[in-house]
Amino acid sequence: MSYIEKQEFLTELKTRNILKDISSPEKFFNLKPDQGIYIGFDPTATSLHLGNYISISLLKRLQKIGIKVLAVIGGATGMIGDPSFSSKERKLLDFKTLNANKEKIKKQLESFGLPVFDNFEIYKNMNILDFLRDVGKNINISYLLAKESVASRIEVGLSFTEFSYQLIQGWDFKFLAENYQIIGQAGGSDQWGNMVTGLDFIKKSNLVQKDEAFVFTTNLLTDENGQKFGKSLGKPIWLDPEMYSPFHLYQFLLNQNDEQAEKIMLWLSFLDLKVINELIFKHKNDKKQRILQYNLAQEVVFNIHGDKGLKIAKKITKILFEKLDYTEITFKDKLELKKIIPYFKVSFFNANQIIDLGIFKSKRELNEFISHKALEINGSKISNIGDITEELKDKSNLFLLRKGKKYFFIIELI
């Protein structure tokens, strides 16, 4: 990739409002074909979330233009917990949990076509004396204390364990530069202090690459309330489809306001800027159609969950919101619905049972819905309370109830 092409790439990141800071644009422009860039992912949960996808999509953008990339799982850093701009100390994970998290996140990252390295490999044979002599000797304590991410925690308390986090992240960078020709590091803007520590380790080394290393950060994608996107409303938007379904992600994106939709489209989609601007223009001319939101939902769900996930999300959306004919609802659709709408298992099925389940508050309310022809079971409109029998079950012993226009339930007869 040429010098000019790298300039154009950086300009596009700025236009998309992805890029926040870069230590040296010139060093990025002079990146050699055998040199690369990495981003770290700590295994603090069994899945990455939408906030992490900003970093994943950045690695994919770099990969697409021919730059070598590496996703680094924090097997070592994850054992400590990053204190950066955190108001309290993070709970330490036990080894069993950490290893289980690592395996799942490794598979997630690999599913996006990214090569993966576990930083635990760097430290597994290093003892405390090695660490103090090789790592600790190369950094000044006053320099570390002056960092904003550390200073903000000093008054409320910061353990030596968390204080060491930036040393390990910094040493990662030096190790990767020395052994894998990874001379660039990227990350969220809250990682700047930790990343610069790595630059300092490299500059003080005897590496031939010591004057070539650089770091750059991305803006943090936030919701309309200024909260990090991965943890909107206190519920992480997981990338694992079993933890946060493609349907829920599709609906989440579909319901973004215009300003947020435009921002997320620029950040998370791989559509050409010209195409995005055309979509924004069309949307502004006919906002009722929500052209921007529909295209955003399609792009992001497809990129994360593939064509299969997108088809499921769109099909469930049709079932729940567009009055799809019951004959078009397959058994697989019902299995997906079980993850999304209230699901019950029963040993018998009748009117009293669905009242006992809380679907209706009383027999009176049930009769009101029936009289207004507002109750369907497996596609059949119920006209009499006595029609609610087990004979309505499908071949899989399932009942799909539609109460009014908005409420759906699945009941399984066992």
From Swiss-Prot:
Subcellular compartments: Cytoplasm
Biological processes, Gene Ontology terms: tyrosyl-tRNA aminoacylation
Catalytic reactions on record: tRNA(Tyr) + L-tyrosine + ATP = L-tyrosyl-tRNA(Tyr) + AMP + diphosphate + H(+)
Enzyme class: ligase
Binding site for ATP: K231
'HIGH' region (motif): residue ranges: 43-52
Gene Ontology MF terms in the entry: ATP binding; RNA binding; tyrosine-tRNA ligase activity
Motif ('KMSKS' region): 228-232
Pfam families: SYY_C-terminal (PF22421), tRNA-synt_1b (PF00579)
Binding-site residues for L-tyrosine, renumbered to this chain: Y38, Y165, Q169
Matching InterPro entries: aa-tRNA-synth_Ic, Rossmann-like_a/b/a_fold, S4_RNA-bd_sf, SYY-like_C, Tyr-tRNA-ligase, Tyr-tRNA-ligase_bac-type, Tyr-tRNA-ligase_bac_1
Keywords from the UniProt entry: Aminoacyl-tRNA synthetase, ATP-binding, Cytoplasm, Ligase, Nucleotide-binding, Protein biosynthesis, RNA-binding
CDD domains membership: TyrRS_core (cd00805)
GO CC term (a single one): cytosol
S4 RNA-binding domain location: 349-414
EC number, as in UniProt: 6.1.1.1
NCBIfam families registered for this protein in UniProt: tyrS (TIGR00234)
Similarity comment: family membership: Belongs to the class-I aminoacyl-tRNA synthetase family. TyrS type 1 subfamily.
Subunit-level organization: Homodimer.
Stated role: Catalyzes the attachment of tyrosine to tRNA(Tyr) in a two-step reaction: tyrosine is first activated by ATP to form Tyr-AMP and then transferred to the acceptor end of tRNA(Tyr).
Protein name: Tyrosine--tRNA ligase
Naturally occurring in which organism (per UniProt): Mesomycoplasma hyopneumoniae (strain J / ATCC 25934 / NCTC 10110)
